[in-house]
């Protein structure tokens, strides 16, 4: 059930948000032409910008030059991100989500709804939602009184509309009541997308709504630090279900809280990107942006 209650958004958009239109086009171009190693001048011409403007665009958006960004999304770099993944998950289990190695990452706390709540498919649940600018395109943020329940992106590469992005999320919990209150969700959006607001004393609160197995997979995703990656098989082994890589892949694909629950940090075992519900261009953007964050920290 949808109900509109529009109120003003008084929270400033993330500083990098206006740049994503150009960044998205640049990533698509670089992905198609990477074997040719296109020059800065060629990339700038494709974007309709000058070389200096293009260089500053990338530096402002992620702290990397275009050349460094391309290196961050290569398969060789991805394989490096996967090194030691099994021990990484084990170590993360010991130190939790606020260890010193995660000081450049978003801080979160989470709780999971009971299996009974999940089976009711959102019945009796009110979910506020709003659309907000982000460094990765327009984001749909959804929250209950207990915390953020959903975060999606409007997929420009597929020509997706806001209504289609909303429908993609509401079908997960069809019995819930949905109220458009962007002033409420803007606070969550700012804490998620503005690194200056990433503080251990003010973590983003999440509520995970899924099956027991899905929640276990999503909790494992929360253990992957920024700048690192694991494979679907690594997650299956960590959960003691070595033969369940396919089921893990399905659960990763059903993650309703993108970016915060970092399903983009899951790759195939050979370093290939695999899939991403909100498009591979955006997955590359997330990986490259996070590489820049790690280098700056």
Place the predicted regions along the sequence by residue:
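Short beta-strand-to-turn element immediately C-terminal to the catalytic PLP-Schiff-base lysine
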Residues: 142, 275, 288
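Basic nucleic-acid-binding alpha-helical/helix-turn surface characteristic of O6-alkylguanine DNA
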Residues: 1-95, 101-243, 291-297
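Short, basic/aromatic-enriched C-terminal tail that caps enzymatic domains
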Residues: 279-297
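Short glycine/serine-rich loop segments
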Residues: 243-285
């Amino acid at each position: 059930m949808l109900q509109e209650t529009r109120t003003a958004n008084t929270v400033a958009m993330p500083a990098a948000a206006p740049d994503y239109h150009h960044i998205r086009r640049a990533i698509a171009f670089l992905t198609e032409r990477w074997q040719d190693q296109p020059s800065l001048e060629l990339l700038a011409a494709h974007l309709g910008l000058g070389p200096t403007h293009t260089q500053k665009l990338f530096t402002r958006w992620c702290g990397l030059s275009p050349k460094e960004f391309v290196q961050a999304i290569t398969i060789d770099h991805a394989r490096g991100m996967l090194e030691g993944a099994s021990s990484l998950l084990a170590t993360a289990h010991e130190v939790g989500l606020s260890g010193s190695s995660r000081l450049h990452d978003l801080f979160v706390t989470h709780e999971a709804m009971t299996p009974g709540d999940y089976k009711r498919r959102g019945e009796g649940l009110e979910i506020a939602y709003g659309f907000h600018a982000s460094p990765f395109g327009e984001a749909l943020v959804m929250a209950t009184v207990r915390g953020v329940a959903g975060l999606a992106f409007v997929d420009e590469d597929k020509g997706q509309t806001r209504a289609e992005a909303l429908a993609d999320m509401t079908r997960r919990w069809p019995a819930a009541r949905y109220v458009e209150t962007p002033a409420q969700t803007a606070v969550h959006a700012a804490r998620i997308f503005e690194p200056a607001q990433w503080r251990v004393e003010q973590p983003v609160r999440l509520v995970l709504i899924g099956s027991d197995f899905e929640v276990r997979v999503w909790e494992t995703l929360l253990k992957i630090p920024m700048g690192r990656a694991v494979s679907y098989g690594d997650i299956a082994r960590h959960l003691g279900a070595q033969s369940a890589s396919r089921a893990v892949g399905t659960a990763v694909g059903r993650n309703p809280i993108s970016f915060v629950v970092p399903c983009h940090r899951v790759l195939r075992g050979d370093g290939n990107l695999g899939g991403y519900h909100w498009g591979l261009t955006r997955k590359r953007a997330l990986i490259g942006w996070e590489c820049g964050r790690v280098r700056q920290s």
